[in-house]
Amino acid sequence: MQDVKTYLSTAPVLATLWFGFLAGLLIEINRFFPDALIFPFFQF
């Protein structure tokens, strides 16, 4: 079990999870605010 924890905490695994999450977040932002260079809720 300790070996599995060590494997899952290595940098490539964490980087893959982080970049996958970030890509999904950017895709969802672009779905709701397409082609937004400045987001509508920041305009005054």
UniProtKB/Swiss-Prot annotation:
Family: Belongs to the PsaJ family.
Pfam families documented for this protein: PSI_PsaJ
Primary site of residence: plastid
Membrane-topology annotation of the record: Single-pass membrane protein
Gene Ontology terms describing biological process: photosynthesis
Keywords, in A-Z order: Chloroplast, Membrane, Photosynthesis, Photosystem I, Plastid, Thylakoid, Transmembrane, Transmembrane helix
HAMAP family: PSI_PsaJ
Record-annotated membrane-spanning stretches: 7-27
InterPro entries named in the record: PSI_PsaJ, PSI_PsaJ_sf
UniProt protein name: Photosystem I reaction center subunit IX
GO CC annotations on file: chloroplast thylakoid membrane; photosystem I
Function: May help in the organization of the PsaE and PsaF subunits.
